[in-house]
Curated annotation (Swiss-Prot):
Gene: trmD
Alphabetical UniProt keywords: Cytoplasm, Methyltransferase, S-adenosyl-L-methionine, Transferase, tRNA processing
Name of the molecule in the record: tRNA (guanine-N(1)-)-methyltransferase
Gene source species: Frankia casuarinae (strain DSM 45818 / CECT 9043 / HFP020203 / CcI3)
Domain of life: Bacteria
InterPro entries: Alpha/beta_knot_MTases, tRNA_m1G_MeTrfase_C_sf, tRNA_m1G_MeTrfase_TrmD, tRNA_m1G_MTases_N, tRNA_MeTrfase_TRMD/TRM10
Pfam family, one: tRNA_m1G_MT
Amino acid sequence: MRADIVTIFPAYLEPLRLSLVGRAQEHGTLQIHTHDLRMWTTDVHRTVDDAPYGGGPGMVMRPEPWDAALSQITARVADSRPRVVVPTPAGTPFTQRHAEELAREPWLVFCCGRYEGIDARVIETWADDEISIGDYVLAGGEAATLVILEAVTRLLPGVLGNSASVADDSFSDGLLEGPVYTRPPVWRGTEVPPVLRSGDHEAIARWRRSQALRRTLLRRPDLLEHREFAEADRVVLAAAAAEAAGRMLPAPTEGTGLIHHRDVEGPGEG
């Protein structure tokens, strides 16, 4: 995969040399090219922004540098057009499914906006995707590009040493991943669930599925909407819902206090 990133702060993308994304580049799986948008300005001040039409605070990124940059970058590979991604809080929410879709592309171009954003005419002309990484506002698109590109890179063939890691990820099957444990078997008085040390792979798979369902119900119930579940899953969800409803019970002593029970996700389920 090739990824081109256009920004006015190229140094912001230095972390892409590290860890998994850096190794993907070393192994030739991923090629990243970072471009300074100011290289396509035409005035002595290398201006990339101007006041917004209609008034209002802040500045808007001018269309001319963006058009010149994207025209030149997209012409560098003959007979191929990249998928152009603009990170923006006004975009479509980024999900694991979106990462999987982008990972199938041979060439991505990321446009990192700043200030109040990029002139809408650039978006209409060039963008294939406007993507939001959450319901909050950042100073620019660079941090979002780091997030998106790492999520995509780990899905590329051969990047992860164990392909099962991808299959077990949160969201890989639409559920959050359950709790994970390693050595020692007992730490600060808390024992690793015995089922995980039993060697019974079917029981372990059932436990992990149960924990994923429970965690998703508690933390992201929206992910369970409009889905069909097997009978075994429905039993787990019903039990988890009942336990969650019982977390706050009237205190057995006089008064109106409540007993708060711990989260229904428990390490001891077998």
